[in-house]
């Protein structure tokens, strides 16, 4: 009954707001743009408004109280008669919300924590930037246009990857990324924690992973692969720090997807424990941005014992459904010559198929074995699209990065997929077609408009659309060594990706988006202290 009354009230108010008036604004400036917006006449003065929570959870009440503190902080504690009232409505999706903005009262509806969180994120974008900084300007305009907003995301997975192996970023720097993700309603932080260039997660059973594998003897300079700055480089996160980040992210509606890349991209582990490799070493962490030939020896049972021990600790720290196991860029040259791996191939009866080698099927075996182990822990596997090569077992989720074809193939074969094609979603690529204007990095050109124009369901049959879980942008840090550089590459392109993730195609408009970013969102980014590319077109 309450749900029906809510929908009737929303419809009635929308009709009222649609009445013609001279002062109606064209856009609310919100990114990502909501599913349905009806802008009316007049405005609500939010300065000093009383913020009320009715029937919300304790965690949601904390969110609402936080908004109330921001609104009243600059008003000398004087609370006006105008109200912003938050309440629950049955039947709404967990990430759905609705906002009715009248001249004296705002009603906010949701059914769960994330819906309330996103409603607040939207309201804050309608207010002066003081709500992000806490530094108040008496001349700021706190008037919010009267409107009805009904909103929910298009995709469940709205992700962003940060590579902390190639370059290490301190906890506070990671949290600053989580903060800006929350502003734009991203909800999955893919944390790339291990690679050939450094192991970043404390594993208590294998302390050398961070003591040895967490540090490399220098880093190449620019594009010169023969160069080395000679500076010992590294760092790692303790499990206590990681748990703190998990809690911090959860408050912002973000789940963390940790990645332990295997069986390739493992030189940091091999350097610490050489017996895990096919040759026995010695190994050393890579100092150049390249793909290592050395990978885990999967003919040895000790390698699987290592994998299971590591993933057990990963599951203890990260409580969410998905664990990313990499699976990308795995050269087979060591396996081809390794007696242990060849014995495993013979034991399993693996054969070349003409399309795939026995070593490809050996990697399928690794994926399936790890998948089965994680299933025993109540977890699911995500892997890069290379895990499709050969004979993938049901239940894995594909992350399509080498273009869109991996996601299309996955969906057509009944696998879930997350779309992150490099030509649209790799934000370590240049924002300009003139690399000399950009920091040193990969020369591929991915401007804001290209990010914004990506349609993740193109090429996917309609009856397979449900297999596309969402979209993710990635920042790989081979050439990105500072927090400011990460932010510059991320912003404002992440805002464009956020509309791909959240907004339906019919609700997207690049001209509107560009104006909203230039006129309002840059002000938010600046107020929060982010470095960003100030021109979204060159």
Q: Predicted segment positions?
A:
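Feature activates predominantly on carbohydrate-active enzymes
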Residues: 22, 93-304, 308-322, 338, ...
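Active-site neighborhood of glycoside hydrolase catalytic domains
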Residues: 269-275, 286-394, 401-409
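Flexible, acidic glycine-rich loops studded with aromatic residues
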Residues: 380-396, 401-538
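Acidic, contiguous N-terminal accessory segments
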Residues: 21-156, 375-388, 392, 519-538
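Bacterial Sec-dependent N-terminal signal peptides
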Residues: 1-29
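Flexible loop/turn segments at secondary-structure boundaries
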Residues: 60, 168-170, 196-202, 263-269, ...
